[in-house]
UniProtKB/Swiss-Prot annotation:
One of its GO terms (biological process) is ATP synthesis coupled electron transport. It is found in: Mitochondrion inner membrane. It holds the Pfam family Oxidored_q2. Gene3D superfamilies: 1.10.287.3510. The chain crosses the membrane at residues 1-21, 26-46, 61-81. One of its GO terms (molecular function) is NADH dehydrogenase (ubiquinone) activity. Keywords: Electron transport, Membrane, Mitochondrion, Mitochondrion inner membrane, NAD, Respiratory chain, Translocase, Transmembrane, Transmembrane helix, Transport, Ubiquinone. Core subunit of respiratory chain NADH dehydrogenase (Complex I) which is composed of 45 different subunits. This is NADH-ubiquinone oxidoreductase chain 4L.
Length: 98
């Protein structure tokens, strides 16, 4: 495995560990999820460029669209929880059930 791919994989694993360790605050979890999506985007982009597979060139763009949607929903949820409860603890999300 090339050095660049190894570094990107380590960045993904570090962001995943960040989600597991800092799971009490919503903002920390969202930042770690963005790090995971960024490392996945770079890895998919490098893979499609190295394989010269023309049909997969759209995959990084689709991944960016999903990352943008995830960020928008996460930030909307963060604003709603912060305005309602005054803090961004993830345990407050259990209270949002209808």
């Amino acid at each position: 495995m090339p050095l660049i791919s190894t570094n990107i994989l380590l960045a993904f694993i570090t962001a995943l560990l960040g989600v597991l360790i800092y799971r009490s605050h919503l903002m920390s979890s969202l930042l770690c999820l963005e790090g995971m999506m960024l490392s996945m985007f770079i890895l998919v982009s490098l893979t499609t460029m190295n394989l010269h597979f023309t049909l997969a060139n759209i995959a990084p763009l689709i991944l960016l669209v999903f990352a943008a949607c995830e960020a928008a929903v996460g930030l909307a949820l963060l604003v709603m929880v912060s305005n309602t409860y005054g803090m961004d603890y993830i345990q407050n999300l259990n209270l949002l059930q209808c």
